[in-house]
Amino acid sequence: MKVFAGNSNRLLAEAICNYLNLPLGKATVRRFADQEIFVEIGENVRGEDVFIVQSTSFPTNDHLMELLIMIDAVRRSSARRITAVLPYFGYARQDRKPGPRTPISAKLVANLITEAGADRVLTLDLHAGQIQGFFDIPTDNLYAIPILARDVKENYNLKNVMVVSPDVGGVVRARALAKRLDCLLAIVDKRRDRPGESEVMNVIGEVNGKDCLLIDDIVDSGGTLCNAAEALLKNGATSVTAYITHGVLSGGAVARVTSSMLKELVITDSIQPTTAVQSAHNIRVISTAALLGEAISRTSQEESVSSLFD
């Protein structure tokens, strides 16, 4: 077994290798003067079970091309099996046609990864579960809920916790955490007037005097979370913390979060944190290395990964 990584999330790749007690594979990813991407694998992979760790996060297209070219390089080097490990799967929000004459980009990206030569895909908290079906190769979609629940138990009195979904679409995910913590569930009902903006309307559930935990898969602009936090506090919540798997945090999101009423934003390292994220006083990053490392180990040894979903 060998593990390689592109440039998108080398810190996580190194942490995964530390968990597996393996060195990170030698690979060079560089650009020519015209910005074409060039990949060179620096060690023998013939007959090896190869795992390539690459989040297709910002800059999404560059990191996606790095992944595809790296898969091709490993395939042409006679690897026995190639697993694309995608802690964050970019384009996942384009999982359906929002109108006429529009693409389903998530399906296109799945096709590209398959055609490049990947034999398996391992990912984390896909934005929509049906994206698993976009791949024509075995795909394991791990859940971050166990990691988030463990952190909540270490930092909160569960008797005073209320799990909150920031919108109706995230109720299933929030319910899974609430069930694991044996806590009550509330929902923030919001209306989005235009793309990139969200207006909180009302809170469904009694949050007065509760430590509210907003749960979602992606935080992008941060507008939804900040508005939800304000609404919850107006309804009597003692504090509001957000637990989000993927910290996209584009544009002015970090500044928006740091100046908001959120007590804390807890994200995973599925996307490598920027300097701004690392220096923010109310943003904390927790590791997925053990979860992904264990899944990689079991996959390589042909063992079941189903217990990792519990």
UniProtKB/Swiss-Prot annotation:
SMART domains xrefs: Pribosyltran_N (SM01400)
Cofactor: Mg(2+)
Stored InterPro entries: PRib_PP_synth_CS (IPR000842), Pribosyltran_N (IPR029099), PRibTrfase_dom (IPR000836), PRTase-like (IPR029057), Rib-P_diPkinase (IPR005946), Rib-P_diPkinase_bac (IPR037515)
Residues where Mg(2+) 1 binds: H127
GO BP: any one term: ribonucleoside monophosphate biosynthetic process
Catalytic activity: D-ribose 5-phosphate + ATP = 5-phospho-alpha-D-ribose 1-diphosphate + AMP + H(+)
Gene Ontology cellular component list: cytoplasm; ribose phosphate diphosphokinase complex
EC number: 2.7.6.1
This protein's pathway: Metabolic intermediate biosynthesis; 5-phospho-alpha-D-ribose 1-diphosphate biosynthesis; 5-phospho-alpha-D-ribose 1-diphosphate from D-ribose 5-phosphate (route I): step 1/1
Enzymatic class: transferase
Residues the record lists as binding D-ribose 5-phosphate: R192, D216, D220, S221, G222, G223, T224
Residue numbers annotated as active site: K190
Binding site for ATP: D34, Q35, E36, R93, Q94
A GO MF term: kinase activity
Major subcellular site: cytoplasm
Family statement: Belongs to the ribose-phosphate pyrophosphokinase family. Class I subfamily.
Subunit structure of this chain's protein: Homohexamer.
Protein's name in the database: Ribose-phosphate pyrophosphokinase
Organism: Rhizobium meliloti (strain 1021)
